[in-house]
Amino acid sequence: MEQRHTREEKMAAFGRMLDVLDALREKCPWDRKQTNESLRPNTIEETYELCDALMKDEVADICKELGDVLLHIAFYARIGEEKSQFDIADVCNHLVDKLIFRHPHVYHPSQIGAPNPRPLPYGEENDEREFAKVKSVEQVLDNWEQIKQKEKDGNKTVLSGVPDALPSLVKAYRIQDKARNVGFDWEERRDVWKKVKEEITEFEAKVETLYNNAETEEAKAAAKKHATEEFGDVMFSLINAARLYKINPDNALEHTNQKFIKRFNYVEAKARG
């Protein structure tokens, strides 16, 4: 891997960004006015712009959008510092200590809080600590959830770590994945297809009731409610199938969106002559 910048240059660039942010916070009316609440919508927008660049694999845009997201992280830290709550060093140190704690196969817990954390020798054979030995990515993921449960301020339940504000499709995937990490999953992944077909059949029956058998407005409202619930079950089961076959459903749907847009634009252009 070619090194574009030295460690010193990277640290200097980060410090340069903090210096500029400090100046903007003091001298720019717009930057000075911002709060956590006012920045939040912009943060969401910048995150989606980064996701868009990642999906399109546009390197220049990825670099640009990463900078925008990084600015927001530093901005929130600056606001926290002004309130004497925390600063960017606290953010970084908390992250590093969490990573060390959650990677016992890479770091000994004695390295938590160390200025220069030192990883364990590769393939340490005499380390009998819990979670210290892993042989696969799946084992790392399984250990991850169990380790999080042991944290002092960790999640009290398996699913409490899933943010309420996640988009529903992503949220469903995370719920299922977290449940899998504690053993709640299909014994055979092919068994999920029976569930998918069952949910589609139930949805079809409710839709037929809605459009063919419901005569009163009250009956139509009830049928629509049930059909909506059944469609949710269909979506949840399809997301489960995608997960079991190691397909990210959000990425898959976005690829289809882009494919449709490309084809539609082509048809539209031809129609215009």
Language-model features, listed with the residues they occupy:
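Flexible "arm" and connector segments at domain edges
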Residues: 1-65, 71-116, 121-231, 235-273
